Amino acid sequence: MEKDAFDYYASHSSMSDLRGARAVFDSLPNDPAALSRVIQGLGVYDVVARDFYGFQPPPDRLNEIHLRPVAQRVGRMLTLDSKPLHVRRPPERRALGRCNSFALLLVSMLRDKGVPARSRCGFAAYFNPPKFEDHWVCEYWDAQDRRWCLVDPQIDNVWRSRLDIRIDTLDLPRTHFLAAGEAWRRCRSGEADEESFGISFAGLRGLWFVAGSLVRDMAALNKMEMAPWDVWGVQPGPADELDFAFFDGLAALTSDPDATFPELRRRYESDDGLRVPAAVFNALTGRREAIGVDATIRERQKAFAPN
């Protein structure tokens, strides 16, 4: 991996930075597997909270899934239960989240230890096979094996039992999680059916959905880790005509971010349709929302953009 990319992904983003509260991570273990177990004791996936964990989230807590920056999410976790973060909470005292919040929390913990890590937006094959469901995971640099590893910190023993998940979610096979660019490539080449990619229970699927995920993955690779329902810029709707050449180019850039790192950074920072604005449209709430990050940190991120 190029040193510029190594340094970039080892440093915090505006979304992953705890800012003045980093001491709360001091008691945490070092390895990704142990950190994933910690995270599983801090968060609960709202959609399955009742059926999987016996906890019915009250209406006044449902907005927790919209907390984007880790600093806000950890603050909420400590409001629900003030014990140190390594202490496992019962489900009713865990913060509500979705796949992106589990992934970003692991990214934050690893970056805090100087480990290169990044959120990846794509599609997982282990929730509803043979479908590829919209999903986010953490990708971190394993210095010993000198390779990027995919980790899904959301999947605990409850998920494993309920969905009969047998793969190693601490070192995900690349066949079982496709980053958005790879999903796009397979759909475009005819290797995969575009109707297999999306959110099955919501009836959202198709190449337009893959294109939107590709924009979110591009943003995440530029350390703007957004929510799955955040919409901005060039993300298409289901009835929009797709610019195939444009998204083919994005897929090529994101397929090997280390090799394309300088161009990936330049392209993102120079394209208003790709770059995350100060406010985005939240497709779940139906309104525009400020993304809630420190502009100073965003400017510091831009300093990493190659000349």
PLM segments and residue spans:
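His-Asp-centered catalytic microenvironments across diverse enzyme cores
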Residues: 2-15, 36-45, 51-59, 123-136, ...
